[in-house]
Amino acid sequence: MSSNLRPLFWTLPLTRLTPAEWEALCDGCGKCCLNKLEYEDTGELEFTRVACRLLDGESCRCRNYEIRHQFVPECVRLTPKSLKKSVYWMPATCAYRLRYEGRPLEPWHYLISGDPETVHDAGQSVRGWTVSEAEVPEEDWQDYIIEDL
């Protein structure tokens, strides 16, 4: 872990985190990079196995994180201020959502376990089961809906 991170920073209110601490809060699951279907009439939201074309399916990280908006302008910019608008679609296990809701991080989170592989070992990441949006037309995404995320 980077030396510019305060001990137990993840227990602080999100608004008190430094930019480096904010970024370090991500558990690396990759679930936020899954495309979602949102039904306007019901507001229902369904995750699909169809991932952003920039997601590395093995590492579950963005291939071009720093400049991702040049390639995917609609990619969400999560900040402490924007989180309120986005938290409803974030996975229940997401560290940002958990902390926003005042809950602790999961035991498999690397900040708790000390190992960035535990998110994958615990089966909490998208490693190995996504398909790139470059390979699936949007009209077929409903064929890739995930029943239980």
Curated annotation (Swiss-Prot):
Coiled-coil region(s): none
Pfam families reported in the protein's UniProt record: CxxCxxCC
InterPro entries found in the cross-reference section: Puta_zinc/iron-chelating_dom (IPR005358), UCP006173 (IPR008228)
Top-level taxon of origin: Bacteria
UniProt cross-references to HAMAP family, sorted A to Z: UPF0260
UniProt record similarity statement: Belongs to the UPF0260 family.
Protein name in the entry: UPF0260 protein RCAP_rcc02083
